[in-house]
Amino acid sequence: MRRQAAAEQSGDRSPHSKKVASYKTAFLQGLRMTTNRSKCASTVFIAVILSGAAVPHVSRVGAQTSQTASITIDASKVENRISPLLYGQFLEFMYQGIKGGLNAELIRNRSFEEAPNIAGLSRYWERYPDDRNDDYALAFHWDDASAYPPQRPKVDTGERAMKEHSPRVDARDGAIQRHGLYQARIPIRAGLEYRGYLWLRADDYKGAITVALESDVKQGEVYASADINVIAGDWRKYEFTLRPEHSDPLAQFVILFPGRGRLWLDQVSLLPGEAMPGGVRRDVFEKIKALKPAFIRWPGGNVAQDYRWLWGVGPRDERFTWVNLSWKNELEPSDFGTDEFILFSRAVGAEPSITVNVEGRGATVEEAAAWVEYCNGPRTSKYGAMRAANGHPMPFGVKFWEVGNEIWGDWVRGHSDADTYARNYNRYARAMRAVDPSIKLIAVGDNNMNWNRTVLRAAGENIDYLAIHHYYGRREMAGDPLNLMARPLFLERFYAQVEQLLREIVPGERIKLAINEWGLDLPDERQYSLESALYGARLMNVFERSGNLVEMSAVSDLVNGWPGGIIQANRQGLFVSPIYLVNQLYSEHRGDKRLAASISSPTFDTSREGSDVPYLDAVASRTADGRKIFIKAVNTSPTSALTTTITVQGVIAGSQAEIETVTAPSLTASNDFARPDAVFIKNKAARSGRSFVVTLPKHSVSVITLAVR
């Protein structure tokens, strides 16, 4: 996952004219909601702005005294198909993208591998009841001589093996009778069942232990508890159920040691009974399912070049905790592995798309082929038998496989030049297809056409999709917010260049694009504002206009990871970004065929992304059965609504339209945990017909649905 935009810039590099400066000032004023300035300017034929035959026609209009626009749709003319795979999503092991965000596991650092504090307790664990008084009768030691499981299969990364740890507990008779350890900030709900377990090895410990959910504020207030009788001997799993009587977003999970003697503790787990397939949080699961993702890409991203898939299969408590080299060496549990990812993806209605590690951190072509066999091989094969032993006798049938991630970037393990990558790609493709010839392979592309040219010439015959990633942000905008509003149109021209390259090197329209990472590098309040949604919607309109080439896309990221995550989930709740809202609307109203459309709109100029850029961006599509037409209209003006005349030719439209609009009182309004609906979707009905007028609010994204007779 590249956290910077493509190096290319476009448009006029000359100094600002007074006209450009005035438009930039107006946009900034619009951001601050201190002006009602409107601009009346001429539009130009959109081919000058966008180029290529796949874009709508915009006619020239004269100077205007009010902000008006028009959209004319020819429903009898289909410009291109729109792929059913177009709107997918992207998950990565990145901070709390998986752990704490997607995953329902409530215990952090449940295998005690994080470094300990002075008391000998690993990260997130504290001494109970607290540190007010000396508890001379209870001692902890972060022990690397005993841990569960005692042995794991070796996965060679070329790195020094990480020692496994568990806390050794010595409990004696003392003044503080109710003592142990705890984790804070556990969100619980009254009446919901919480299923947990832990592993214990008891030496000479005599007595029981107690697990409980308690109040952190009112010490001693117990919501639910269970006693566990400890059996002396080697490692043993103890299960328990807790059903709290009260809700508390900041409860404690407590493990108490009323007995006497020595024991070891490891692999503690606490899951809400409502956890969804793959062990996913219910609230996050429901938000993802509402997006109707066509596919979900995993495990990365940059981290795909670190990840070794064997870490994340097999019994949950026997999996590895691994160091995430891509993201500040965070330790990652392997609770969410291949099986969980596929179960989760299918449960939300998405096809899994797996990115294999190419030569990073000791990865090999044999390992990639083995992963395909684990997912798709018969149970009689070596790795198919492993899958069956893990509870899944039938093949998963994973269709989409990406061969490496951003290999051109020196921030990933396995980085190489294009020639080396192409040779490696061919080796991996042959080995993976030898296991399952039906799989679709995605190769690493770039915004650099020289990279694409080299890879396509050497490996084009083995490629189904070329993955290209787009990031854009503060550095590229150079202080001009209008650059952000225009940037997607540069990418539309870029896709035309890629299409021409494909025709030259790999003719036949066989290879398609997967824009399976796109995002913005903006401060978080702007990431979660309407401004970002306008950029996202215009870019997604570009995807639909480029439907002959672009078949897959995914915003970066789906859950947390960085401010671009469109679902931001903490332990107590979540909110969604305006880009999430756009994704939801566009996925629900994808359409199967894009219709010819011409647009008349006022325009603006930018400092880097060209001039005479239309404020209005629109795409029209229809469903396969022809009974509905969707019009996706983005008004990027920061200050003016657009009174828009819509004319539909070639069909008879119904008398009423449904309009769903992503909007907010101001361009700077942003969603957060305190104000999760500052930017929202507004629904209304409007009169429609062969020709009708709608008002597209300033800085808004609207989807207009027409019934067709």
Q: Where are the predicted features?
A:
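Glycine-biased, low-complexity coil/linker segments
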Residues: 1-2, 11, 15, 40
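Carbohydrate-binding surface patches
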Residues: 227, 612-653, 659, 702-705
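Aromatic- and acid-rich polysaccharide-binding/catalytic face
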Residues: 266, 394-413, 452-491, 511, ...
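Aromatic/acidic polysaccharide-binding cleft in carbohydrate-active enzymes
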Residues: 93-94, 480, 511-617, 627
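Substrate-binding cleft/loops of secretory-pathway carbohydrate-active enzymes
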Residues: 363, 367-372, 446-471, 518-532, ...
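Extracellular and organelle-lumenal recognition/adhesion modules and their flexible linkers in secreted
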Residues: 64-334, 351-355, 363, 369, ...
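Glycoside hydrolase catalytic-domain groove-lining segments
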Residues: 326, 330-334, 340, 427-430, ...
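Aromatic-lined carbohydrate-recognition surfaces of secreted/lumenal glycan-active proteins
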Residues: 357, 387-388, 429-450, 495-521, ...
